[in-house]
Amino acid sequence: GIEYLGLSSINGPLVILEGVQDAFFDEIVEFTVDGKTKKIGRIIELYEDKAVIQVFEGTENMSLDNTRTKLTGHPMEVSLAPDMLGRTFNGIGKPIDGLGPLITDVKRDVNGLPLNPVRRKYPRNYIRTGISAIDGLTTLIRGQKLPIFSGNGLPHDQLAAQIVKQASLGDGSDEPFAVVFGAMGVKHD
């Protein structure tokens, strides 16, 4: 990919790079700070030859003069493998559970393509959570998301753990399925 030296400005988690050519929206960018520290970002806006880049790991230690910016030429991708089941990942898809990296050649764009609702199969697989308020009032269907919003100090983490542990297909099927749990602001207990 194309590499640039220096930044035009740094403002919180955003940096501006001028003189950019052949960049695209949502392109992943790699920063090298002081010749060694690596950080990752994503282009969130393009205007003429300027790119606004969101830095995922913060802009600490980044300088206007000594930061190298490399355009990767691809959007954010996540590695996929059966070994992902039971693992813990950070927000950019890197394992944080101490079990090492995923070994796979399969990567997918996290942005995906929009689904045509007319061509989508009608959802039929009920998910039993074992929590009567959810099962009776806000029934979950396979493939659906269940947001859990909670105030500080409430047992939202215990509720989420209970759902993940008890979830099963409601029709009594032994067909395997996975629960994908994503969270912000919870402890890794």
Regions found by a protein language model. Give the residues of each.
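P-loop NTPase nucleotide-binding/switch module
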Residues: 67-70, 76, 83, 93-145, ...
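Small-side-chain structural scaffolding
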Residues: 15, 23, 41, 51, ...
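Conserved P-loop
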Residues: 154-189
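The Walker A (P-loop) glycine that initiates the GxxxxGKT/S ATP-binding motif of P-loop NTPases
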Residues: 150-151
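N-terminal accessory targeting/assembly segments
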Residues: 1-87, 91-92, 96
